[in-house]
Amino acid sequence: MLGLHVGTLISLSLCILLEPVEGSLMQPCQPINQTVSLEKEGCPTCLVIQTPICSGHCITKEPVFRSPFSTVYQHVCTYRDVRYEMIRLPDCPPWVDPHVTYPVALSCDCSLCNMDTSDCTIESLQPDFCITQRVLTDGDMW
């Protein structure tokens, strides 16, 4: 009985000691300001802006035993509440609609990745990647 009690105290103490370390290393799932690029086929430049996106750590569990009959679902930091804003890209030809809509994160949540609204890949391009010439929102070129 004493061994069980001592083992429990050691486990509890270890959890209490490790909790602040883990909390300080991983940011929670929340909106953060991020530089992103907006571009559209037919327009010669991409616009670089700052907007809130969802980013941070979500607790996930990896099963010890993997069954071929079950699926493992991992939670990711994704949009809970989102607003869409529209911006006009500069220098688009007259036959191309210069307006681009982009999401603005109002709140975030750890949930399954929705491929309709999020980039669910393991490795993707950075959010500020541009194929065309970059223009800052103040008009300067990169």
UniProtKB/Swiss-Prot annotation:
Glycans are attached at residue 33. One of its GO terms (molecular function) is hormone activity. It is found in: Secreted. One of its GO terms (cellular component) is cytoplasm. Residues 1-23 form the signal peptide. The keyword Glycoprotein applies. One of its GO terms (biological process) is G protein-coupled receptor signaling pathway. The keyword Disulfide bond applies. Disulfide bonds join 29-77, 43-92, 46-130, 54-108, 58-110, 113-120. Pfam families: Cys_knot. Keywords: Disulfide bond, Glycoprotein, Hormone, Secreted, Signal. Belongs to the glycoprotein hormones subunit beta family. Involved in gametogenesis and steroidogenesis. PANTHER family: GLYCOPROTEIN HORMONE BETA CHAIN, LUTROPIN SUBUNIT BETA. Heterodimer of an alpha and a beta chain. This is Gonadotropin subunit beta-2. The gene is cgbb.
